[in-house]
Amino acid sequence: MKILFCSAEAYPFSKTGGLADMAYFLPKSLKSIKHEVVIITPYYKQIAKHHDKMVELARFPVRFGGIETIVILFGLNHEGIDYIFVQNMHYFERELLYGYSDDAERFACFSYAILESMKALKFYPQILHINDWQTGMFPYLLDTHYRHQNDQYYSIHTLYSIHNLEYQGSFDTYTSRFFNSDFNYTYIHFDRVNFMKAAIERATKINTVSPTYRNEVMTSEFGFTLDGALKNRAKDFVGILNGIDTELYNPNTDRLIDVTYNKKTYRKGKLLNKEAILHHFNLDVDLNQPLVVYIG
């Protein structure tokens, strides 16, 4: 299958959390079983250091909400995977990836740019895999603005992956103008534009990071007010447990740990790494006491 993997961040080029890691290891795994996978992500300021290895693929205007801006697509092959970077200096080349007052506008631009890139590059995926709130408006825009344009748009299926339901992309209603439409039940939630709700309502299929989390987010306690929308899509909503990239996180080659080890030397290696962590955090060096390390 042709898969276009859309992510607001992608390791090793940009990262604030686990989404970037998933954008690294999942496409590699899909390619290993003979799928054609392309990753598309914003060209952030920190990505400029890789620019010399890129080639320009296309440039075109993007129009939305009375705004017209130019985006440039750059391509790079990294570890056998094709990456496309969406460059717009105004929206993306900033110090941080997120957290700006115009985030709705920024990721509206990203959404339109990707949908327009399909025409520019003549690459129409069978599966458009979108992730978290930043890409949540894709299914709505695809349905309302693009499917009617040609058979290739019409036949695209969308998979929406929820990594953290708490961050929904909720904005004032004035941002609806960026989607060239009147208010629509798809994306309005408690009188606000909600990117994640739009994806839950419109995506062909929905998944999240584990079967347990899938069940949790359909409860009022952990659903962050979207449990009702998820229950309505329950038959299309699955939990698939995230794994790790065993090449990237290989203790035999990992340069980020003090002592590497393998299945023959793991007892000594883990003990030495435990000792190093205790020293690093100025804790009592008692190797007989359990040490619990949590990253989250």
Regions of interest found by a model, annotated:
Residues 1-296:
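Catalytic cores of nucleotide-sugar-dependent glycosyltransferases that transfer UDP/GDP/TDP-activated
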